């Protein structure tokens, strides 16, 4: 009898990142205003997934959990991928999340739009690192789940009440 090998599935929690090689999938749940960043090296079929909460670490004294912040998590994820054999020049990015989960009549609260700021900082950091952003599913007012398939590089976006989307 032939053994069936099930690909590894690794969950990525809020303010965490993980790296994995194919075959396998990285999954993060509950992306509201948070942003999920999938980085992929197609030749090595390896990638990483980060689930960031905040755009910028500069306003915080406690930066002990670097995975919380877009500006630091992406740097650390890139370093981890390179440390495991990925080539920086081959990395591409796909992102999801950055939603406006709460609406308010208060103009001041609207200016705090953390989802939009998270997505903007992720784009800026990727651009500064010269990592092409090849696909995204951001904005709106709904949560998302990201499922990153390391075999194909596809990122599946699951949203309640919407069709499954592949980016």
Swiss-Prot record:
Pfam family, one: CheD
Molecular function terms, GO-annotated: protein-glutamine glutaminase activity
EC number: 3.5.1.44
HAMAP family: CheD
Gene3D superfamilies tied to this protein: 3.30.1330.200
GO BP of this protein: chemotaxis
Lineage: Bacteria, Bacillati, Bacillota, Clostridia, Moorellales
Disulfide bonds, paired cysteine numbers: none
Organism: Moorella thermoacetica (strain ATCC 39073 / JCM 9320)
Reaction(s) the record says it catalyses: L-glutaminyl-[protein] + H2O = L-glutamyl-[protein] + NH4(+)
CDD domains registered for this protein in UniProt: CheD
Entry-linked InterPro entries: CheD-like_sf, Chemorcpt_Glu_NH3ase_CheD, Cytotoxic_necrot_fac-like_cat
The keyword Thylakoid is annotated on this UniProt entry: no
Chain's gene name: cheD
Keywords: Chemotaxis, Hydrolase
Protein name, entry field: Probable chemoreceptor glutamine deamidase CheD
Biological role stated in the UniProt entry: Probably deamidates glutamine residues to glutamate on methyl-accepting chemotaxis receptors (MCPs), playing an important role in chemotaxis.
């Amino acid at each position: 009898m032939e053994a069936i090998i099930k690909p590894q599935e690794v969950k990525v929690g809020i303010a965490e990142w993980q790296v994995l090689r194919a075959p396998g999938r990285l999954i993060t749940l509950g992306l509201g205003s948070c942003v999920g960043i999938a980085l992929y090296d197609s030749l090595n079929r390896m990638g990483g997934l980060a689930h960031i909460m905040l755009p910028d670490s500069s306003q915080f004294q406690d930066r002990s959990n670097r995975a919380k912040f877009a500006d630091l998590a992406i740097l650390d994820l890139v370093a981890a991928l390179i440390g495991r054999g990925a080539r920086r020049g081959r990395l591409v990015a796909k992102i999801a999340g950055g939603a406006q989960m709460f609406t308010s009549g208060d103009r001041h609260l609207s200016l705090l739009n953390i989802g939009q700021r998270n997505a903007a900082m992720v784009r800026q950091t990727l651009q500064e690192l010269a990592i092409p952003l090849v696909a995204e599913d951001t904005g709106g007012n709904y949560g998302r789940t990201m499922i990153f398939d390391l075999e194909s590089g596809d990122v599946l976006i699951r949203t309640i009440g919407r069709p499954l989307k592949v980016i």
